[in-house]
Amino acid sequence: MKALDKQNVAQALSVVPGVVLQKSGSRNEEQVKVRGFDSRQVPVYFDGVPIYVPYDGNLDLARILTNNLGAVEVSKGYSSLLQGPNQMGGAINITTQKPTKPLEANLGYRQGWSRSRDNAYDMHASFAASSDLGYLQVSGSQLKQDFLGLPHGVNNDIAGKHGKMINSSADDKRGIVKLGFTPRENDEYTLTYIKQDGEKDNPPYSGNSGQKSRYWQWPEYDKESFYYQGTTQLNERFTLKSRLYRDTFENTLMMYNSLADLKNKKGSYSHYSDYSDGAGLQLAADVRENDLLSFAVNWKDDVHREKGAPHAAYDRYEDRTWSLASEYQWAAADNVDVVAGISYDWRDSVEAKKHENDGSITHYDDNNQSAFNWQVMGKYHFANEDTLALSYYDRTRFPTLKERYTTSKPAYNQIAIVNPQLKPERARGGRFNLEWCLHARLGI
């Protein structure tokens, strides 16, 4: 990511084969599609912890900076069901760095210019220390943009003046604290805290389609995550992995639908206050010399709260999701590996409450859904580092809270119908994958 100068996760993912960057105009979001599957169908994980937004499954990946990250991985065909539910189209996993030396430190700063003016800067710093008993890593980063530059010759009230695009600022800050304890060679226990504070504006459309320009701002796009992860080798055959987490999301939107509204700060208001609690256990057993049998149980509670005025009461929606999964990795021959996985997922509606304009409260009926998933992959290893893999999957994802409960009026005067009993979406597909190394630094 650093070598390619990718400043956020969306940009980093855009260079992965089969991944397409998708920019949203109305919400000024950067998301990706993985072989045609969108963010609702491809969950995003941070060190294996799901961080996608509970309400609609979306997440603005441009808000996640790449400084001090270890890697960003995309699972397209075969995606381990041990991670949890809703992996219909695969999964994206972002991993944080771990120190590799007794003492490490890093400091960086970059300045950006547009139209002969400084318009942005990027800075980051990190410190880490490690020993045989564990490690500590602290890092922080900020990417701030005051404005986007306008082309020469563009100077009007809608787009902006003096080379500055109106309503185009952004400010993203992130801090990470990671504490690890390694009492034995194969045991590791980590506590991680991540705080992300984001602000962004959405520049107006200034084309000729007749579309009305609007000036939306997000003074708050904040995520906070705290999680524990443990790996314990119980004996020579069994290994237990454990996970416990809380992830929160605070999102405030100010909707100014004209330049006059923007100047007078007169517009509509929307606020989300969401959180997710979850836990997981994974037990792995060495069945034969090179075979591995794993079992996993995952639990996740998603709570979405929203209101349309600063002093209004919250609408509240809560789902509880469970997943039981198993996976077997079989070394069929010296150069042939086979891996297969199954899972059974179920989701229960705990609460769905909406405050109506007339002061009444609507309580939607409880609802629940379940789904079975399975997949298999075979991989052949050639004499060199080339591999040939063939996989087939049958996976699902549960409808989001937005898909089941939204009553917002869509465009073109359509009517939204509440559908709490909406069933899981399912995808079946196969993948043929050849990794062919043409040269030490070149492959297909």
Which sequence ranges carry the predicted segments?
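Non-catalytic regulatory/gating segments with a bias toward low-complexity or hydrophobic composition
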Residues: L13, A71-V74, I92-I94
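Extracytoplasmic beta-strand/coil segments of soluble accessory domains associated
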Residues: A10-V49, G70
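Periplasmic-side early beta-strands and strand-to-turn transitions of outer-membrane beta-barrels
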Residues: T100-S116, D122-P219
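Transmembrane beta-strands of outer-membrane beta-barrel pores
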Residues: Y109-W113, S131-L133, Q142-D146, K195-E199, ...
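Surface-exposed extracellular loop regions of Gram-negative outer-membrane beta-barrel proteins
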Residues: E199, E250, V303, W346-D358, ...
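Short acidic/polar hinge/loop motifs at secondary-structure boundaries
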Residues: L21, V49-G77
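Repeated loop/turn-to-beta-strand initiation elements of outer-membrane beta-barrel proteins
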Residues: L103, L133-L136, E185-Y189, E236-L240, ...
